[in-house]
Amino acid sequence: MKKRILSLLLILVMTLSLLPTAVLADEAETDYGITIVSPDATTQIDVTSKNYKDVMLDGTVSYDPETKVLTLNDANLGCIGASQIQKPLTLRLVEDNTITTPQGIYSNALTMDSLSIEGDGRLHVKAQLYAANFYVGISYQQSGGEVTLEGFGVLNGSSGSVKLTGGKLTLIGGMPQMDKLLDAAAGTKLALFYEDGKDLGSWTLPTDSTNWSGLLSTAAKMTLTAPAALDEASLAEL
């Protein structure tokens, strides 16, 4: 009897040794360093190896940990924090997306070391404080889509660059450093507006005129439209 029990135990041990580790224990959960907050601030979700394919459980937010691309697909969010990732965060825009910081919470909508925008969707960011807050200088790149950044201050950082190679970027709020930060493709159209929407002027970059930089303290809104976006708009009118 004892021999039989020992034999059964030996068979059990051998069988278990053949099973993959994942069957015996749950894989360790990896935190990807991105936190997403809902518009009403009732939900705060960390993007991890367990939820990255559908972060909000409604198909609007997904993440690729290999490429560091966070895809927004008709998402309605409160804010995104991504200060812990080692590579620049890329937002891929699909359809219409909004990031609006909760009312009564004096906070930034986007907080990270650097940010890149791609895709052909749209994103409107409205913050109680800064629309985009960067820890180590401003590092903003946009290659497509339509992005509106609106806040008490638009881009917070004393140095760095705002690079536009495609799409359209609208800034609403304080933007006193843009003449030093802007790195736009040749042919980009820049326009400035008063708070009431009246036109302050428009320029095609690069331009010898420095009038637009002198108007930054007066302007309440700036639009930057890359050449490719201008061509697409012209074709749409045909």
Predicted features and spans:
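Positively charged n-region of N-terminal signal peptides that target proteins for export
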Residues: 1-10
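C-terminal segment of classical bacterial N-terminal signal peptides
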Residues: 16-23
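A composition-driven surface/loop motif
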Residues: 26-238
